[in-house]
A protein has these predicted regions:
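Short coil/turn segments at secondary-structure boundaries
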Residues: 42, 148-151, 201, 377, ...
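Intrinsically disordered, low-complexity acidic/Ser/Thr-rich segments used as protein-protein interaction/activation
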Residues: 82-100, 104-319, 323, 327-361, ...
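Eukaryotic basic, amphipathic alpha-helical target segments in cytosolic regions
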Residues: 34, 38-41, 172, 221, ...
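Amphipathic alpha-helical interaction motifs in eukaryotic regulatory proteins
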Residues: 11-14, 28-32, 38, 137, ...
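Charge-rich, intrinsically disordered regulatory segments
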Residues: 1-130, 157, 557, 574-595
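Residue-level detector of short, conserved catalytic/binding motifs and their immediate flanks
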Residues: 28, 134, 184, 369, ...
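C-terminal effector modules of eukaryotic transcription factors
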Residues: 305-596
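Amphipathic alpha-helical interface elements that mediate macromolecular binding in regulatory proteins
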Residues: 8-11, 28, 162, 211, ...
Length: 596
């Protein structure tokens, strides 16, 4: 047999001991099976060190070393010492950047949905070779590289990630490690990575790791729920399932409901809102099924009464949630954003500001639940235009003309869309270029916040505890890292809810030009997050050169501060035309990650 030398296959195929097709940049065998290709990097060479200490040198060589040392000492008497402090390892820099800006600032257990807030405390207790440690190190280094060097590098093969995958499979097969909370959390980290990969490549995210985490929680639920961390993870899984059920118009899955005590762990206002979200998902599925039945057979008005009553009861629960939420969570209305260069982009010149983007995201979820209910009501009213006022009275407590009820519902949709649009200036500010490490120190980026002098009414700020408000530096770091993600979620929802079978009922409720503005803002957030490369012959966005070490950017922008670059909002519709299918896939991947 001819010896062709060492295998040239990818690291994943080598570990699995299967033949690799050696495709570049990733092999097709891995891609077809939904595996992460480990790439073709050679393992580090084994180094052999030769002793070079004084006792190991030859006598003649020792004399030469002594002469050089004495000479260096004499010359150093007249010159300052040179600092040779070693730079931190790349992994340490990456963890500090990711945990600090994405999982630290602006997050807390009071508003937590149970994922990002757990990472740093859990990592502190983990050994270096645990699945969670390896997964976080791999994810963090990919995120840091994307910000430092190449905004389109996230989906390139990564050897560290392939090693972490192998370690997770070992942990799941081990009876003791599979019961560990850190193993479940590691699976969620891998799912978060899968979601980011899908978003950046505009593809549909797979649920493999999420379903695995659900299976582990169901298998060891009672044990895992005995700790606060375990209960937080259950809430996170519940939120992701609610979002997926609403997007896919299906009921909340019984597989998640089988997790013990899920309904008895509200914990905080965001978790209480998620419990209402279960009812929203179920009634949406019920209305959709009802509309499909109407197309096949006539139904009686009494079949409609319980559905209208259910819609109204859920809406009352949503209004009660708003009235009982922390006062510190209430948004502050700003009638006019301040002037900057480039300008802060807003729909009608106004915006809302929040304590942080995580709380703004929770309010966006609340508004999206209301939109789902309003849309369901319009579907029923449109399907049964001759419904009697008596049926409406049963559901709403008073007789109403059907046309008046429909007009009131459309007005509520318009007001809710306006509120969701007011989130965008808070999250996006005046950003018009692809995000890079330079943005963390850039002085030309501006965001409406409670730190802006004259922006907020001082009496309105009194409802926010000052000891819980972020410093200006922490707020800017937090919103530059996560703001575009939290704008992307409501923007993709608003477009998606207008694109499906009954989307015209919602779109007809909006004022002219509003959907076009939403499309442009979605395109701007896509540009900032580098989800697509610029179109041919388009202007070049501000990029950063490879940075130095931890925390120092070492960047040189290719544009002057304030220049428009690739992010000229007037060009976004041309550069980034997204189909309804792409918007729906984007929304699905975002929701599977918990909205980032």
């Amino acid at each position: 047999m001819v010896n062709h030398g060492a295998s040239k296959g990818c690291l994943t195929c080598k570990q699995r001991r299967v033949k690799c097709d050696e495709g570049k940049p990733g092999c097709q065998r891995c891609l077809r099976r939904g595996r992460e290709c480990g790439g073709y990097e050679k393992p580090p060479a084994t180094l052999k060190f030769k002793p070079q200490t004084f006792s190991y040198t030859r006598p003649g060589r020792r004399a030469h070393i002594i002469d050089r040392a004495n000479s260096a000492k004499d010359s150093s008497d007249s010159s300052p010492p040179i600092s040779r402090t070693p730079s931190p390892p790349v992994v340490d820099c990456a963890l500090a950047f990711f945990l600090g800006n994405f999982a630290g600032k602006g997050r807390g257990f009071a508003s937590s949905r149970g994922f990002f807030e757990l990472l740093a405390p859990a990592l502190a207790k983990e050994p270096q070779d645990s699945p969670l440690t390896l997964a976080l190190c791999a994810l963090s280094t990919k995120v840091l590289k994307q910000w430092q060097e190449d905004p389109y590098s996230f989906n390139k093969p990564h050897r560290r990630l392939a090693h972490a995958y192998a370690r997770l499979r070992t942990a799941i097969a081990d009876p003791n490690e599979s019961r560990s909370q850190s193993t479940v959390l590691a699976a969620l980290v891998f799912q978060f990575h899968e979601n980011l990969s899908a978003v950046f490549s505009m593809q549909k995210a797979q649920r493999t790791h999420h379903d695995g985490a659900v299976a582990l929680m169901n298998q060891h639920g009672a044990e895992l729920l005995s700790t606060p961390y375990g209960r937080h993870m259950v809430r996170y899984l519940m939120f992701v399932e609610i979002a997926a059920a609403i997007r896919e118009k299906r009921p909340f899955p019984t597989s998640v409901l089988s997790i013990p005590e899920i309904a008895n762990t509200p914990g905080n206002p965001s978790a209480a809102l998620d419990l209402i979200g279960i009812a929203v998902a179920n009634v949406q599925h019920r209305v959709t099924s009802f509309a499909e039945r109407l197309a096949l057979e006539p139904l009686l008005e009494r079949d409609l009464e319980p559905i209208l009553l259910q819609l109204d009861n859920i809406h009352i629960r949503l209004l009660d949630w708003r009235n009982t939420v922390f006062k510190a969570w209430n948004p502050i209305y700003v009638p006019k954003v301040r002037e900057t260069n480039p300008p802060i982009i807003s729909y009608q010149g106004d915006c809302d500001i929040y304590p942080d983007v995580q709380i703004s995201s929770i309010w966006s979820n609340w508004r999206s639940y209301r939109i789902v209910l309003f849309k369901a009501a319009l579907i029923l009213l449109r399907q049964l235009p001759n419904i009697s006022p008596r049926v409406v009275q049963v559901a709403y407590g008073e007789p109403q003309d059907i046309q008046d009820l429909e007009q009131t519902t459309r007005q509520s949709i318009q007001e809710t869309f306006d509120a969701m649009c007011r989130v965008v200036p808070f999250c996006m500010g005046n950003r018009t270029r692809t995000a890079s490490m330079h943005d963390m120190v850039a002085v030309d980026l501006h965001f409406p916040s409670y730190h802006d002098p004259g922006t907020c009414d001082p009496s309105a700020l009194e409802q926010w505890p000052k000891d819980e408000m972020l410093s200006l530096a922490n707020h800017l770091g937090h919103i530059k890292a996560l703001g575009a993600w939290h704008a992307l979620t409501p923007l993709s929802f608003m477009l998606s809810v207008c694109n499906d079978e009954y989307g015209s009922l919602v779109a007809e409720s909006l004022r002219p030009g509003q959907l076009q503005w939403i499309r442009k803002e979605l395109a701007r957030s896509v540009l900032v997050l580098s989800m697509r490369k610029s179109a041919p012959n388009s202007p070049t966005s501000a990029q950063s050169s490879p940075s130095g070490q931890c925390g120092t950017t070492g960047t040189t922008p290719t544009e002057e501060p304030g220049s428009s670059g690739a992010g000229n909002p007037d060009d976004n519709d041309t550069l980034y035309k997204m189909s309804a299918h792409e918007v729906e896939q984007l929304r699905g991947s975002l929701r599977l990650s918990g909205g980032a």
